[in-house]
């Protein structure tokens, strides 16, 4: 572990956070920022609006971290206790800052309001603290070193205000005061078609690396590997990451579909665009989810022509030319129907590729032979048509089945496009 004097700790203040009424997006933002600045960060604490418990949290944090970053509790109401509690912790008196009063009065005047007594509370800071201005609101923060080797930073809980104060004032201060001794450079590799456990088994030796480090993540069917290097410069970090990325890509093969801000839809779009090819989709159980993923990509109109949400069998027949006999014999959720849907939309819109999805998203509608979570994906292309079966299960619910099905359809198309190269 790094020297505690150069470690940061985030303390989020607010009973609403403890109750789960709001997400702690401030802590997430600050954690990512600290990582990018290369400042070690090992602990986070959430404390309600209670003076004694906040004092206890501060005393614990001050023994293990040299930079304590507080969000919340800077407002004008009685339960906003952060500033006065910190002053009490270090036995320092509060003093009113005239420049804060002037700033609040000006902001109130622009809104046609008059400064009230409770807002004067926001101008109280411990003697010796440096003002951390709030350009957007009335609650300023502070940067304060109550003792050698300890720095406190306070921010309001409003995310937009906190982020602006952090970026405009706190980050420059950290650079000027030698907190950013190295930077962290990261590369995120993205995988589809392999489970987290299977990928982890393949790349297990990489998890023992120290610089760069490799860590796995998984959500919504996608697996990610984050490669992170500590370095003196971005160029040095990139150089450390490059050979590790090359090895990981070689091991994973085509299960690795992209990196950083890539998505399955953006990768598929780039492949189609480069080949001058086009796509249409026919969806049943995803109800437009596949088309939505595609149309989030800027410029997708160059290669995506449109689609059909063929929920009812009559629509499958009239729009996609799925035969009534096939529907009667195999059922709407079947490989042959998925293939006929893909061919039907390909032919109707005249595109290079047609992709279809039909399945049972649940929670009802499943049978012993066709359970909830059963999905068929059809891919029609220049060299023919095929389908794949996936059984996602019912445990994670309807949205999970729909999200995975849309992602899998894009991945099957991606793999088909790569096979043409």
UniProtKB/Swiss-Prot annotation:
<protein>
    <recommendedName>
        <fullName>CinA-like protein</fullName>
    </recommendedName>
</protein>
<dbReference type="Pfam" id="PF02464">
    <property type="entry name" value="CinA"/>
</dbReference>
<dbReference type="InterPro" id="IPR041424">
    <property type="entry name" value="CinA_KH"/>
</dbReference>
<dbReference type="Pfam" id="PF18146">
    <property type="entry name" value="CinA_KH"/>
</dbReference>
<dbReference type="InterPro" id="IPR001453">
    <property type="entry name" value="MoaB/Mog_dom"/>
</dbReference>
<comment type="similarity">
    <text>Belongs to the CinA family.</text>
</comment>
<dbReference type="InterPro" id="IPR050101">
    <property type="entry name" value="CinA"/>
</dbReference>
<dbReference type="Pfam" id="PF00994">
    <property type="entry name" value="MoCF_biosynth"/>
</dbReference>
<dbReference type="InterPro" id="IPR036653">
    <property type="entry name" value="CinA-like_C"/>
</dbReference>
<dbReference type="InterPro" id="IPR008136">
    <property type="entry name" value="CinA_C"/>
</dbReference>
<dbReference type="InterPro" id="IPR008135">
    <property type="entry name" value="Competence-induced_CinA"/>
</dbReference>
<dbReference type="InterPro" id="IPR036425">
    <property type="entry name" value="MoaB/Mog-like_dom_sf"/>
</dbReference>
């Amino acid at each position: 572990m790094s020297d505690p004097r150069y470690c940061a700790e985030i303390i989020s203040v607010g009973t609403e956070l403890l109750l789960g009424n709001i997400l702690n997006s401030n802590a997430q933002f600050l954690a990512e920022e600290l990582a990018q600045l290369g400042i070690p960060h090992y602990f986070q604490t959430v404390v309600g609006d209670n003076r004694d418990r906040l004092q206890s949290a501060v005393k614990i944090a001050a023994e293990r971290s040299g930079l304590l970053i507080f969000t919340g509790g800077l407002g004008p109401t009685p339960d906003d206790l952060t500033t006065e509690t910190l002053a009490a912790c270090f036995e320092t008196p509060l003093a009113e800052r005239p420049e804060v009063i002037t700033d609040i009065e000006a902001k109130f005047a622009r809104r046609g309001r008059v400064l009230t007594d409770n807002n004067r509370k926001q101008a109280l800071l411990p003697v010796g603290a440096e003002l951390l201005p709030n350009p957007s609101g009335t609650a300023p923060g502070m940067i304060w070193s109550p003792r050698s080797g300890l720095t406190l930073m306070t921010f309001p809980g409003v995310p937009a205000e906190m982020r602006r104060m952090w970026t405009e004032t706190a980050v420059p201060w950290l650079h000027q005061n030698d907190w950013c001794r190295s930077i962290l450079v990261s590369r995120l590799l993205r995988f589809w078609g392999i489970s987290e456990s299977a990928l982890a088994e393949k790349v297990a030796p990489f998890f023992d690396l120290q610089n760069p480090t490799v860590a796995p993540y998984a959500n919504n069917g996608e697996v990610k590997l984050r490669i992170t290097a500590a370095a003196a410069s971005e160029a040095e970090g990139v150089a450390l990451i490059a050979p590790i990325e090359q090895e990981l890509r070689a091991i994973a093969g085509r299960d690795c579909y992209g990196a950083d801000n890539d998505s399955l839809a953006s990768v598929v779009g780039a492949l189609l665009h480069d080949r001058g090819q086009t796509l249409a989709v026919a969806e049943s159980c995803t109800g437009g989810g596949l088309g939505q993923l595609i149309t989030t990509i800027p410029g997708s109109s160059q290669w995506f022509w449109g689609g059909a949400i063929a929920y009812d069998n009559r629509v499958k027949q009239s729009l996609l030319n799925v035969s009534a006999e096939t529907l009667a014999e195999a059922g709407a959720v079947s490989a042959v129907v998925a293939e006929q849907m893909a061919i039907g939309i390909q032919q109707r819109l005249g595109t290079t590729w047609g992709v279809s999805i039909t399945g049972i998203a649940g929670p009802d509608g499943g049978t012993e032979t066709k359970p909830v979570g059963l999905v068929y994906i059809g891919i029609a292309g220049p060299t023919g048509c095929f389908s794949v079966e996936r059984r996602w299960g019912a445990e994670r619910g309807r949205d999970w089945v729909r999200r995975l099905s849309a992602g899998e359809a894009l991945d099957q198309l991606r793999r088909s496009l790569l096979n043409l190269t």
